[in-house]
């Protein structure tokens, strides 16, 4: 008989026991933002008409276009079915990055790293790839202190609010060292910076608070390097990382050295080739910090299983005992 990890057994028990018996002992937290949707443009049905939002939808920061939703009907004698067609980018909203999302060239592929054609894509992920024990890193207090210098509002100018890699307002090597004893096979590191509050604040990458001219918290290069050092030393591979920013990396690590993305996306370059997965644009991570013991929480990533997919919008849950 196969020996399943404890977090798998916990989740299996949750799914099998009726809610009337389990809800009193478990807390479920939705870590996903809603996906705003728009009617299609008359000129191009693949593009959103931002003047025609559904309900209270507003545009969100994204590397793809806004989500397009159009409807057809299937009539019956008693009424009809609404049938929606949804057009959106894989890496839009709260979403999963599979290990195959980044394709390393020969200069960035490291010993022990897998070539892109050897990594799992969306349809190749099994259930154990999408669940895991939660390990919390909470830097929201440091972020709040920095934002207080500007009335709680992020500024793209690091002289006003500083989220550069050399600041103490991003996840650094010391934060990773602090959780070293919890780094193990299959765990998911969850990084709460409190940044999701700015998610619906606009789509201009240079000016609006969420991207903030790539001056935002996340993992700096030293944190990524320390995580790999610890995994290699212990001979383990974490399941993934969840963060409430647009891309796991700090803004400075994401944008790199210049406007040509030189030495950019450090976490993506080094971790995805090892098989680590990412959940980006997460929501409500602060709620996890308020449970009695976040170490008793598990992550569930409800990712799509489309063939050749490099990721996908996901309903992500934390289930806490």
PLM features: residue spans?
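Hydrophobic alpha-helical segments
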Residues: 9-10, 90
């Amino acid at each position: 008989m196969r020996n399943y990890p404890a977090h798998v057994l916990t989740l299996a028990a949750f799914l099998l026991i009726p809610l009337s018996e389990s809800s009193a002992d478990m807390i479920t937290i939705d870590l996903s933002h809603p996906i705003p949707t728009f009617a299609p443009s008359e000129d191009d049905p693949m593009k959103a008409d931002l003047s025609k939002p559904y309900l209270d939808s507003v545009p969100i920061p994204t590397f793809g276009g806004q989500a397009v939703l159009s409807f057809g009907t299937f009539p019956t004698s008693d009424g009809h079915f609404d049938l929606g067609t949804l057009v959106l980018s894989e890496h839009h909203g709260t979403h999963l990055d599979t290990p195959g999302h980044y394709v390393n060239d020969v200069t960035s592929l490291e010993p022990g790293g897998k070539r892109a054609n050897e990594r799992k894509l969306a349809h190749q992920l099994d259930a154990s790839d999408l669940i895991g024990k939660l390990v919390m890193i909470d830097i929201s207090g440091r972020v709040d202190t920095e934002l207080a210098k500007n009335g709680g509002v992020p500024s793209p100018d690091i002289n006003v609010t500083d989220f550069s890699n050399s600041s103490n307002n991003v996840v650094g090597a010391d934060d990773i060292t602090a959780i070293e004893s919890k780094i193990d096979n299959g765990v998911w590191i969850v990084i709460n910076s409190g940044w999701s509050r700015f998610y619906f604040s606009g789509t201009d990458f240079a000016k609006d608070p969420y991207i903030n001219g790539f001056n935002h918290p996340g993992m700096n290069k030293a944190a990524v390097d320390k995580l790999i050092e610890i995994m290699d030393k212990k001979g383990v591979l974490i399941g993934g990382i969840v963060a409430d920013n647009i891309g796991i990396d700090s803004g400075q690590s994401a944008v790199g050295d210049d406007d040509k993305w030189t030495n950019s996306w450090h976490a993506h370059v080094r971790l995805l080739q090892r098989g680590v997965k990412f959940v980006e644009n997460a929501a409500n991570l602060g709620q996890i910090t308020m449970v009695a013991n976040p170490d008793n929480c598990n992550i569930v990533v409800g990712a799509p299983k489309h063939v050749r997919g490099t990721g996908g919008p996901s309903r992500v849950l934390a289930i806490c005992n």
